[in-house]
Amino acid sequence: MAQLYYKKVNYSPYRDRIPLQIVRAETELSAEEKAFLSAVEKGDYATVKQALQEAEIYYNVNINCMDPLGRSALLIAIENENLEIMELLLNHSVYVGDALLYAIRKEVVGAVELLLSYRKPSGEKQVPTLMMDTQFSEFTPDITPIMLAAHTNNYEIIKLLVQKRVTIPRPHQIRCNCVECVSSSEVDSLRHSRSRLNIYKALASPSLIALSSEDPILTAFRLGWELKELSKVENEFKAEYEELSQQCKLFAKDLLDQARSSRELEIILNHRDDHSEELDPQKYHDLAKLKVAIKYHQKEFVAQPNCQQLLATLWYDGFPGWRRKHWVVKLLTCMTIGFLFPMLSIAYLISPRSNLGLFIKKPFIKFICHTASYLTFLFMLLLASQHIVRTDLHVQGPPPTVVEWMILPWVLGFIWGEIKEMWDGGFTEYIHDWWNLMDFAMNSLYLATISLKIVAYVKYNGSRPREEWEMWHPTLIAEALFAISNILSSLRLISLFTANSHLGPLQISLGRMLLDILKFLFIYCLVLLAFANGLNQLYFYYETRAIDEPNNCKGIRCEKQNNAFSTLFETLQSLFWSVFGLLNLYVTNVKARHEFTEFVGATMFGTYNVISLVVLLNMLIAMMNNSYQLIADHADIEWKFARTKLWMSYFDEGGTLPPPFNIIPSPKSFLYLGNWFNNTFCPKRDPDGRRRRHNLRSFTERHADSLIQNQHYQEVIRNLVKRYVAAMIRNSKTNEGLTEENFKELKQDISSFRYEVLDLLGNRKHPRRSLSTSSADFSQRDDTNDGSGGARAKSKSVSFNVGCKKKACHGAPLIRTVPRASGAQGKPKSESSSKRSFMGPSFKKLGLFFSKFNGQTSEPTSEPMYTISDGIAQQHCMWQDIRYSQMEKGKAEACSQSQMNLGEVELGEIRGAAARSSECPLACSSSLHCASGICSSNSKLLDSSEDVFETWGEACDLLMHKWGDGQEEQVTTRL
């Protein structure tokens, strides 16, 4: 690496040193430019104004200059939130550039308002925008003000920009192949991806959605789903898109948190976004918004307590106080309703509008009846497997038994129910539910079993020993398929566990584990096939016949396993069962004395066991553990979401009767069929247009109702957004706390206030100051002060040292020097007295400010106290009663000889302070006025042009440092 810095070899004692130098040096600022930027930093309005005026005349200062951090004067003013200096700079036509973006990122609302209202004068010569942005811009070209404001999620700034009618580019679809997307991706794929990410980051801002969307809940649903799908395509930015998707989900959930009544909740959850569907009055109170939330997998929204409370109320309709009842009462009630489900179903078939017919339509009763029907079906399957009705086992085509005839209506009822569900919800929605796929497989197996039994009954009439049947006999295949369908039917009962709070999370964890098993099987099958191919290739030549083996048995199922790797299928079986320890090692032996072949085969077999058992199996366990832990961490949300999907399946109209009663046509079904047949094949003529007028009237009424419902929805959304914004701002202020930025703002306010006080004092000179790193000027001042201070240590804190009876009073380092006030003696007395009366309240307010910051209450007195908590021992100093007179020059000289010398007063011990103060006479009631007056009359004694309160910023720094450490000591200066 050293070769990058020097090339020739140097054998000097310092040859192991690497010379360093600045290779990318920047243009240095002049002394005037440094002073200009420093004045902007400190908030010195007068100095900045003077520098700008001189720049317009003499062109000695580049008002668009930048400090080493790339900040111009305008950016510094924005960072310090100094709006007065910002307005002053804009009035002098400084270069704006990215100032608006900078103000938005700093979240300075006042600066944003000022920049939005700023209009550049026409014809002015600005610095070229391209050069400035290319060199110093902190933002990419695709970032717009509204996008950056949305990234910061500042509601006030977003509102200001939206009122200006700003726009955001519309992102294309995820897999868009238009010319613009293809060309942009080919030219610069990184910029294309970053630009799309920035757009989606802006669109996902909760404040922007709340302000600009008519239906913010639906917008959050769709945007969250789109971002989730986009994370699967943009794998490089998967984490960012998933975070934005989660942000949209939480926004919809937080918005629903603001609902305060059941009416608001019902209006939100029953609202439809498609007006064509809203025109059907029978489909209004069907929780349309909640169905959309389930469709887009908005688990946080669905599991929200307000939503769950409304769902529970609808679910237990007709059973008030159900949750407060004892579990024994609940069990007996459910068992009673379950045993009565046949009578309730018959009552509904006969009279759907009767009390019993309406009772079975309730969601909870419907769930109990369907569960009881399915348990009855499982009980009959158990009877069929136990062969309660004995038949001849050797009949090739046996007729159906009584139990099988009883099972058939249930199977037909299940098939009819699945057909109706697919017809109502659509094929796409049907296949997205895994339980529907399981039902489809189960019903297919039952249909195949019934078909094969019919074929066997028709084709085979005789009796024959079962041992002599061929392998693919229809009866044998039907029995195998019926056994598999019994397993699936029993496992289907797990779906009902979702209704229970204890078994529901376990059922969800089981589903996640099945996904992990499928992922594991993909890798395992690859390993299995690889080793099966190798072992079969090695042992193919050593295959033996069955007659050569004991008991004429060939394969791994024999008492003595043999030919384990003779064929590919046999090898796959052998390797699979070896995972469970069911394969012996001697299967790798061969009858020939080929020890090398046996060694290679045993090594391959051992390697397979190590990979499958030690590596893959432990990986599967880790994956399943991770899935379970993921569910356990979000058990409440996952379970409530799954339970809601179960409940919603019973809230819908239709599917009231459980199998097998659902296959029986009801009078209502005959009525619907007759109306459809009459309207389709026998249309009636309507010469008077009576039906047309009736349809138009009903359409108008439904449309008016939909408009009213939409208006109610917009009112509720408006209230929810207001509450959400108020809560968001309140939480942000609560969580913000005290940060370093707060102390910087406090320091900036004190610095600005200091210059304002100096302007109020008047007669302040504006010296040109240099921000050079050399400390020559400071050392010169210190040497000057040291000359008058004797052997005292140097200190940056300089204050007045007033002699009183030839004894000095030491004060806190609050005031450095007083500027020279030329011509002060010539002013009239009224003017000086008015100035003194004006300055008094200002310093009183300053004392109150410092006392409040220390947590103390300060009462305004004739002698104001100024307290600074800087962790130093308390010291007190009182001004002497300085008698001021402007009558004649002699009296002024006599007053000047009262041993009032300006020097440096350091912070010392508090010892002797009381003694010194007791020797001094009491100060006048307006000590500050006396001090200002004597300073004006003795201006010739002041040989320093420094500001009055130059050390306030340093005292504030020390104050903040000590205040953070919890040291609340006080230094009090009495003026």
From Swiss-Prot:
**Membrane spanning residue stretches:** 364-384, 405-419, 434-454, 477-497, 513-535, 604-624
Q: What molecular functions are annotated in GO for this chain? A: actin binding; actinin binding; ATPase binding; calcium channel activity; clathrin binding; inositol 1,4,5 trisphosphate binding
Mapped to this chain, the residue ranges on the Cytoplasmic side of the membrane are 1-325, 361-363, 420-433, 498-512, 625-975
Intramembrane region positions: 326-360
- Binding annotation for Ca(2+): E418, E421, N436, D439
Gene Ontology biological-process entries: negative regulation of dendrite morphogenesis; neuron apoptotic process; neuron differentiation; phosphatidylserine exposure on apoptotic cell surface; positive regulation of axon extension; positive regulation of cell population proliferation; positive regulation of cytosolic calcium ion concentration; positive regulation of neuron differentiation
- Which residues are sugar-modified? N461
Which stretches does the entry tag as region Essential for binding to NHERF1 PDZ domain?
971-973
Disulfide cross-links? C553-C558
Reported tissue expression: Expressed almost exclusively in brain, in mitral cells of the olfactory bulb, in lateral cerebellar nuclei and in pyramidal neurons of the hippocampus. Very low levels detected in liver kidney, testis, and uterus.
- Which residues does the annotation say bind Zn(2+)? H172, C176, C178, C181
- ANK repeats located where? 30-60, 69-97, 98-124, 141-170
**Location(s) in or outside the cell:** Cell membrane
Query: Catalytic activity, per the record?
Result: Ca(2+)(in) = Ca(2+)(out)
Q: State the annotated membrane topology for this chain.
A: Multi-pass membrane protein
Regulation of activity: Activated by G-protein coupled receptors via direct interaction with GTP-bound GNAI3, which increases the channel sensitivity to phosphatidylinositol bisphosphate. May be activated by intracellular calcium store depletion. Calcium channel activity is enhanced by MYLK, that promotes its subcellular localization at the plasma membrane.
Q: What happens when the protein's gene is inactivated?
A: Conditional deletion in oxytocin (OXT) neurons in the paraventricular nucleus of the hypothalamus increases anxiety, impairs sociability, and causes severe hyperphagic obesity, postpartum depressive behavior and reduced maternal care.
List, alphabetically, the PANTHER family matched. SHORT TRANSIENT RECEPTOR POTENTIAL CHANNEL 5, TRANSIENT RECEPTOR POTENTIAL CHANNEL
Describe the function of this protein.
Forms a receptor-activated non-selective calcium permeant cation channel. Mediates calcium-dependent phosphatidylserine externalization and apoptosis in neurons via its association with PLSCR1. Acts on distinct neuronal populations in the hypothalamus to regulate innate behaviors including feeding, anxiety (flight/fight/fear), socialization and maternal care.
**Recorded family membership:** Belongs to the transient receptor (TC 1.A.4) family. STrpC subfamily. TRPC5 sub-subfamily.
Quaternary structure (record)? Homotetramer. Heterotetramer with TRPC1 and/or TRPC4. Each subunit in the homomeric ion channel (via ANK repeats) interacts with one copy of GTP-bound GNAI3; the interaction is direct and activates the ion channel. Interacts with TRPC4AP. Interacts with SLC9A3R1/NHERF. Interacts with MX1 and RNF24. Interacts (via C-terminus) with CABP1. Interacts with SESTD1 (via the spectrin 1 repeat). Interacts with PLSCR1. Interacts with PKD2L2.
Record-given protein name: Short transient receptor potential channel 5
Origin organism of this chain? Mus musculus
